Structure formats: C-alpha cells, structure tokens
C-alpha cells in the first residue's frame, strides 16, 4: 500500500522516487510502482540525484556515502538540495504518505506502473549482464530474492524491474555473509513461495552452513554463487 500512495504522489506532483541503498525489502516487478535504488558509487549517486532541489525523507535518514572516500562528498545530494523529513525512521511513514496524498488531493490519481519487460535470453560468455538477463528470464511470479551478489550483481535491478511481481531483500550493513541465512529465513517464513539466493563467493564462504539447513528443512531455495574467485568488493574499494 505504501508504494501505491507514493506512486500517487509521484504522478500528482511530478516528483521522483528513490529508495535508500540499504533498504531491507522492496516490492518490485511488472504492475507495481518502480522505485530506483540509491546507487552505491558516490559519483553515480550524485548523478542520479543532481536534479533534485528538495528531498523529502520518509522512514529513512539523509543519504550519505557508505565510506568516507578521499576527495568525495559524504552527502549523496547536491549541496543546494533542501532536505525535509515527512516521517522519521521511528514514525508512521505509511500513514504519513496517505495523509499527504489526501491533503494534496492525490487519492484518485492514476499511478504509473512498471510495464512487463524481459531482456532477451542471452547466450555465450557469462558476465554480469548475461547472468542478470538469465535471472530476469527465469524469475517466477511471487519469488523472494535474497541479493548478496555484491560486485557481480550491480546490474540486476535494471534487468529485473519488468519481471513478474516479486520481493527483493537487500543486505543492510557493511558486513557480508547475510544473504544465504536471509534466504533460509525467507523460505521458512513463506513456504509457499520460491526463494532465489544470489551470493558472491566471498560472501558465501562465511555462512555455507545455510545450505545444510535448507536441505535439512527441505526449503524451496535455489542458490546461485557468483564465483569470480577474487573477493572483488575489496579490490573495488581499494581502487
């Protein structure tokens, strides 16, 4: 429901929507309101937000870079962007969206929804783009995706935004190893839904015991390991 009301406000007021990078869960796919994720890379994030003169925060904090990078700003908004808080992280954000929409007369506005759109099924060499395209083509409706693909999955969201409706679970902190246990928990909680676990090999090595639990409990989890054998996230940060 919150996505619906946010979509009404976006259509009525001509504003853009964006989620924080570390959003725990988002509902995505065809027929739903598409909300892009704040990019991880500072320069890319600034490019995505430079058009905003005002930022209205709902159940989130001011967006800042993950690390304090040399010669890079921490704030992921332009310096002249005015920041307004509609609801803090401890307040009732969904109701705040409803109240704002009613106040502005947006309750009956037609919502712009994500149309169905799948990339062409690829062939040939596996890389970040081709793997993302394969995932998009096989993702079933109602799936829950636990995404800890890290460096190899940076393009996944673009490729999968037009898939059948699904839930996407993100890692929410700086440590890695959460993805496969998160998939296990999702499968226990929602036994009637398929779960897709996407994990980098650097992340997977910390919590391989998740596979044992999934087998023992006969959980409906499909695990994909991105085996680049390089711990690429660390190399990326060092650069």
Question: Where are each of the predicted segments found?
Answer:
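Redox- and metal-dependent alpha/beta enzyme cores, enriched for Fe-S-associated oxidoreductases
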Residues: 2-23, 140-143, 156, 229
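A short acidic, amphipathic alpha-helical/loop segment
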Residues: 2-8, 134, 210-213
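Glycine-rich, acidic loop regions that bind phosphate or pyrophosphate groups
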Residues: 4-5, 17-119, 238
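Thiamine diphosphate
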Residues: 12, 33, 155-239
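Short beta-strand segments
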Residues: 20, 57-59, 87, 148, ...
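Short gly/pro/ser/thr-enriched loop/turn and capping motifs at secondary-structure boundaries
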Residues: 23-28, 63-65, 90-93, 153, ...
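Structural motif
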Residues: 54, 144, 194-196
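Active-site diphosphate/adenylate-binding microenvironment
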Residues: 112-190
